[in-house]
Every structure is written in C-alpha cells, then in structure tokens.
Amino acid sequence: MPVQPPSKDTEEMEAEGDSAAEMNGEEEESEEERSGSQTESEEESSEMDEEDCERRRSECVSEMMDLEKQFSELKEKLFRERLSQLRVRLEEVGAERAPEYTEPLGGLQRSLKIRIQVAGIYKGFCLDVIRNKYECELQGAKQHLESEKLLLYDTLQGELQERIQRLEEDRQSLDISSEWWDDKLHARGSSRTWDSLPPNKRKKAPLVSGPYIVYMLQEIDILEDWTAIKKARAAVSPQKRKSDGP
C-alpha cells in the first residue's frame, strides 16, 4: 500500500503541542522569577520591620517614661491639693465653721435640749413623789405619837389608880390596927386613955428621916414595901390577941 502523507489536522495538532510546551516553559520561568523577587522583597521587608519595631519600641518607652513622669507629677500635685484641703477643713473644724462639724453639733444641741426638758419633768415627778412620801411619813409619825401618848396616858392612869387603891387598902388596914390597939388598952383597964390625955401631954410621933438608901428607891418599890409591912402587921395582930386571951 502506498504511504499516505500526513494530514493537515495532524500537523496543526503537533504545532499546538509545541506551542503549549513553549508556553509552559515560559510560565515556569516567570514563576521562578516571581518567587525570587518575592523572597528578596520579604528579606527587605523583614529588615525594615525590625528597624521599625526597634524605633517604635524606643518611642513607646520614651512615651511611657513621659507618661510616668506626668503621672507622678499629677499624683504629687493631687496630694498637695488634698493636704491643703484637709488643713483648711481642720482649721474650719477648729473654728467650728465646718459643715461636717456644725450639722452634727446642731443635732446634738437639739437632743441636749430635749433631754434637759425630759430631765426637768422627771425631776418634778421625783420631787412630787418625795414630797408625798415625806408627808405620808410625817402623818404616820404624828399618828404613832398620838397613839403612844394615849397608850402612855392609859398606862400611867392605870398605875396611879392601882396605887390609889393600894393606899386606900393600907389606910383601911391601919385604921383597923389602931382600933384593935384601942380595944386592947381598954381591955387592960387603963385609967388613962389616949383620948383622956390633954393635947399638950400627948406623946407625939418622932419625925425620923429614913436611911439614905430609902430615897434611892423608886416610888413604886417604896409603896410595895410599905404595903407588905402593913399586911404583915395586920396578920400578926390576931395571933397576939389569941395569945393574950384566957
């Protein structure tokens, strides 16, 4: 068989393949060039970034130092202002002109007035209670005195009546004994009786003062002794009558 010549389409396809290979080669070369330029630019930019960072760091440090200095100055200024304000307030308080002092002081003065009024009212009530208690005690003391006076009067009256009664009994016993002696004298036949004697010849009873110890006794003791003696004499007289009889 005779050899056929290549067709036109086949040639075109080969030509396109060659052109594509050439284009790919060119593209690879351009990419290599771009990558090289990028690495160079990155190195340059890294060097610039380090310098810029160092410069910015130094600027930040200087700014920070300036800020710290300003802050310390402001703090010192604020401290001086606060100190001066406190001194002024202290002077106002010492002069009793500060509102922090005058307002509580006014409240304390008002409460003081109220407490003084309450204390005055309480004092009045206490004085009334004491006055009433004093009047009650005084009235009770007067009533007690009157009752004691009446009791003492009744006691003394009873004692005096008892003494009077004893004296009456003693007088009656003396009268009885004197009559007995008169009867005895008449029974013996005495010619001279007590009544027949003239008054100038009658023997008077001697006035003899008792021993000193008698006057040292109380009156009630003397009366009791005297009554006991008279009763003893009255008891002895009937025994003498019996002995004198037949």
UniProtKB/Swiss-Prot annotation:
Compartments, as annotated in UniProt: Nucleus; Cytoplasm
A Gene Ontology molecular function term of the record: histone deacetylase binding
Pfam families found in the cross-reference section: Sds3
Gene Ontology terms: biological process: apoptotic process; negative regulation of DNA-templated transcription; negative regulation of NF-kappaB transcription factor activity; negative regulation of transcription by RNA polymerase II; positive regulation of anoikis; positive regulation of protein deacetylation; regulation of apoptotic process
Alphabetical UniProt keywords: Apoptosis, Cytoplasm, Isopeptide bond, Nucleus, Repressor, Transcription, Transcription regulation, Tumor suppressor, Ubl conjugation
Cross-link (Glycyl lysine isopeptide (Lys-Gly) (interchain with G-Cter in SUMO2)): K184, K242
Organism superkingdom: Eukaryota
Keyword Metal-binding: no
GO CC annotations, alphabetized: cytoplasm; nucleus; Sin3-type complex
Region of interest called Disordered, as start-end residue ranges on this chain: 1-58
Biased composition regions of type Acidic residues, renumbered to the chain: 11-32, 40-52
Transferase as UniProt keyword: no
Chain's role: Transcriptional repressor. Down-regulates transcription activation by NF-kappa-B by promoting the deacetylation of RELA at 'Lys-310'. Promotes HDAC1 binding to promoter regions. Down-regulates expression of anti-apoptotic genes that are controlled by NF-kappa-B. Promotes apoptosis in cells that have inadequate adherence to a substrate, a process called anoikis, and may thereby inhibit metastasis.
UniProt record similarity statement: Belongs to the BRMS1 family.
PANTHER family membership: BREAST CANCER METASTASIS-SUPPRESSOR 1 (PTHR21964)
Subunit structure comment from the entry: Interacts with SNX6, HDAC1 and RELA. Interacts with ARID4A. Identified in mSin3A corepressor complexes together with SIN3A, SIN3B, RBBP4, RBBP7, SAP30, SUDS3, ARID4A, HDAC1 and HDAC2.
Protein name as catalogued: Breast cancer metastasis-suppressor 1 homolog
